[in-house]
Amino acid sequence: MIAGIGVDIVELKRMKEVIEKNEKFIDRVLTPEERNLFDQLGEKRQVEFLGGRFACKEAFSKAYGTGIGKVKLTDVEVLREENGRPIVTKSPFEGKVHVSISHTEIMAIAQIILEDD
């Protein structure tokens, strides 16, 4: 049974500006495992990656019904399977978490569906 649905969209230009102004923002968004993946990417892909992960975590907070204030961004971890598919590996939700991320040149969007067992 679906317990929640959340969607978020991020402007990548804005994400790049935030990174340039305050690099500590990266560690407020990413878990250590996510940061490891981030550090292996080129600058353009880093912005897309961070934007996508930020959108995932915002979408999760909407689906979970709390907003980011009650759930820290690092409470949710989105890694990838061998084929590159994103997968939520850590969250406060006890059921199944489905995630989809997409990018264009200017935007990143993510959708989260929470499913009770």
Q: What are the roles of these predicted feature ranges?
A:
Residues 1-117:
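Core catalytic alpha/beta fold that binds nucleotide/phospho-ligands
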